[in-house]
Design a protein with these regions (language model features):
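N-terminal and secondary-structure boundary signal
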Residues: 1-337
């Protein structure tokens, strides 16, 4: 895949944060003034502010797109997993975290859970192949804006995992490799099953990424989350931003900045294998990554998460590029007639 520019900036002032990273990446973007733009946010937490995309960042981005690109059609979109698991709606979470105010700035709010989930894809789970339903944005240019976080399945949770919001609420656990019922009684001490779960989740996210790939990843590292992410972790004041139209490179660079190995993140390895982006970066524009790197305290499951790397390498050594039968796996738009 042709390499796209990756930008890394260092900034600790909220008011200057978006301007600095966007000024740096703007000359390299394919965005046009006539584009219909969607900003995909992450509202994983129903109450946890540091689990979510910060409203101030999105507000600044809306103003930047209008003032510097002349974009007039902007939507802020999300299907909140935090809402689903707390018995609320995405609208409830929008209101709680001030996102209703984007309408005052001329943008629209779109609850992805309210859309028709007309697309279908098969995914790998611990109990076999299952089918999920998902939706798509009608935007010409999608910007995903997320904080850097740890995760109970992957060492790092970034822009690619944010695509889970397109999936029908009750199907999201299947993308992560198991059903909601199985997840509630999952035995994390069973290392083999946990490693298989990590592998399933990585493959599934890479497949979904093919269908709902963002146009631009913007990692808002003013604050991150360490420990028991992606919701119950502790905040980290970090002060960096990563941006790229190669979402795989953006996530890979951020994984390194957080102190983790890129090859330990299953969805990055599978996304690279599927030619969806580069999981290595060259000639980063901006500051040296070594100047920003700050090791995050990993999730308590990290020692088991690290075992997936050897599992994946062993599969490659045996020539198993993908152990899924092609005739079984498909994705298509459901016939609504």
């Amino acid at each position: 895949m042709k390499r796209k520019e990756v930008v890394l900036t260092k900034e600790t002032r909220q008011k200057e944060f978006v301007k600095k990273v966007m000024d740096t990446i703007s000359p390299h973007l394919s965005l046009k003034s006539t584009d219909k733009v969607a900003i995909k946010i992450d509202l994983s937490g129903s109450r946890e502010i540091y689990a979510n995309t910060h409203y101030e960042t999105v507000e600044s981005l809306i103003f930047y797109l209008k003032d510097n690109f002349g974009v007039s059609d902007i939507s802020v979109i999300e299907g909140s997993d935090g809402a689903y698991h707390s018995g609320k709606t995405t609208w409830d979470i929008f209101y709680k975290f001030r996102y209703k105010e984007v309408e005052l700035n001329g943008a629209k709010l779109v609850n992805l859970d309210d859309l028709s989930h007309d697309y279908v894809m098969d995914v790998a789970t611990l109990s076999g192949v299952k089918q999920i339903s998902y939706t798509k944005s009608d935007a010409d240019y999608v910007i995903t804006v997320v904080p850097p976080k740890t995760h109970h399945i992957f060492p790092a949770c970034l822009s690619i995992s944010n695509i889970i919001g397109y999936v029908k609420q009750e199907d999201r656990a299947l993308v992560m490799g198991t059903s909601n019922a199985e997840w509630k009684k999952f035995n994390f001490s069973n290392t083999d099953r946990f490693v298989q779960l990590i592998d399933n989740a990585g493959k599934n996210l890479a497949r979904l990424l093919k269908e709902v790939k963002p146009s631009l990843a913007l990692i808002d590292g003013l604050y991150g989350m360490e420990g028991k992410g992606p919701v119950k972790g502790s905040p980290v004041f970090h002060g960096f931003a990563v941006a790229s139209e190669d979402v795989v490179s953006a996530d890979a660079l951020t994984t390194y900045i957080m102190g983790f190995e890129v090859d330990q993140v299953s969805y990055l390895s599978y996304a690279f294998q599927e030619d969806l982006g580069n999981n290595r970066w060259q000639n980063v524009i901006g500051v040296d990554p070594c100047q920003v790197k700050f090791p995050y305290r990993p999730h308590p499951f990290y020692q088991k998460q690290k075992l997936w790397k050897d599992f994946f390498q062993e599969k490659k050594n045996h020539g198993e590029r993908d152990n899924r039968p092609n005739k079984t796996y498909k994705n298509f738009k459901r016939d609504r007639e």
